[in-house]
């Protein structure tokens, strides 16, 4: 498609930049495309002290892991209630002491409502900005 062609043209202008992708269920391009785009594809990626994974369910709960995780997959959303029956939902960064879940960067995916705990921090994407909730 047109976007992938534009990306490949742009990528060829910056061949020394390193790009890594932790592949998820929406990353459906053939492996040959990622190779042509000079993108390193991983099932998970460890860059001390961080682990990058697609789905939090992929964490091995049986090990004592002190690393911090970044993931995607669930497309976190926060619901804010206003006066009366006003309800607004926003994609968000969902940050806990153990992990951060990144928002979906697409208007075509749904949102999974999160219920943050007191120690969690949420950053909602509102219009063209990011707001701490």
Language-model segments: residues:
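Acidic, His/Gly-rich catalytic cores of divalent-metal-dependent hydrolytic chemistry
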Residues: 78-133
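Active-site regions of enzymes building and remodeling cell-envelope glycoconjugates
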Residues: 35-44, 66-69, 117-125
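Core dinuclear metal-dependent hydrolase active-site scaffold
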Residues: 44-63, 69
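Core catalytic region of metal-dependent phosphoesterases/phosphodiesterases
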Residues: 1-46
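Short acidic-hydrophobic surface loop/beta-edge motif
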Residues: 42-48, 92-95
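Phosphate/diphosphate-binding glycine-rich loops and adjacent basic-rich segments that engage nucleotide
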Residues: 66-71, 75, 81-85
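Active-site environment of divalent metal-dependent phosphoester hydrolases
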Residues: 26-31, 59-60, 75-79, 108-112
